[in-house]
Curated annotation (Swiss-Prot):
GO terms for molecular function: preQ1 synthase activity. It catalyses: 7-aminomethyl-7-carbaguanine + 2 NADP(+) = 7-cyano-7-deazaguanine + 2 NADPH + 3 H(+). The active site is at residues 48, 55. This is NADPH-dependent 7-cyano-7-deazaguanine reductase. It is an enzyme of class 1 (oxidoreductase). One of its GO terms (biological process) is queuosine biosynthetic process. It comes from the Bacteria. Keywords: Cytoplasm, NADP, Oxidoreductase, Queuosine biosynthesis. Pathway: tRNA modification; tRNA-queuosine biosynthesis. Substrate binds at residues 70-72, 89-90. The gene is queF. One of its GO terms (cellular component) is cytoplasm. Pfam families: QueF. It comes from Caldicellulosiruptor bescii (strain ATCC BAA-1888 / DSM 6725 / KCTC 15123 / Z-1320).
Length: 131
């Protein structure tokens, strides 16, 4: 009996589909404070780079802003651009951290991806930046 799933793949896009251009920063009026800002979404998704099967996660972005905040609609569009990108879970979390640090230059940032179980294993990835 042949494995009818062996040759099946879904469309998988490369990293070039990650839309960093949509990200916008807005001025932060309290740079002298160490206020912690936290954004949480249960809707993050990307795909396995080998099979195209979806990887879904709860994503938490926590940071201490310096001069800038991320504009939330732009963040939503940016995160949605990962939807059909073939990227490892560990790489997705680090890429998000790198892109947001470049945009915002925060005092501190942490991105946590809690990926839902696949093959009996769930994955939690924590990436941090400190100035």
């Amino acid at each position: 009996m042949s494995d009818k799933y062996q040759q099946r793949r879904f469309d998988i896009y490369g990293y070039e589909k990650i839309d960093t251009e949509v990200l916008e920063a807005i001025p932060y009026e309290y740079p002298e404070k160490n206020t912690v800002v936290e954004y949480i979404t249960e809707e993050f998704s990307s795909v396995c780079p080998w099979t195209g099967l979806p990887d879904t996660a709860k994503l938490t972005i926590r940071y201490i802003p310096h001069q800038k905040l991320v504009e939330l609609k732009s963040l939503k569009y940016y995160l949605t651009s990962y939807r059909n990108v073939g990227i490892l879970q560990e790489h997705a979390v680090n890429r998000i951290l790198d892109d947001l640090v470049k945009l915002l230059e925060p005092k501190f940032m942490e991105v946590i991806g809690e990926f839902h179980e696949r093959g009996g294993i769930s994955t939690k990835v924590v990436a941090r930046y400190e100035k």
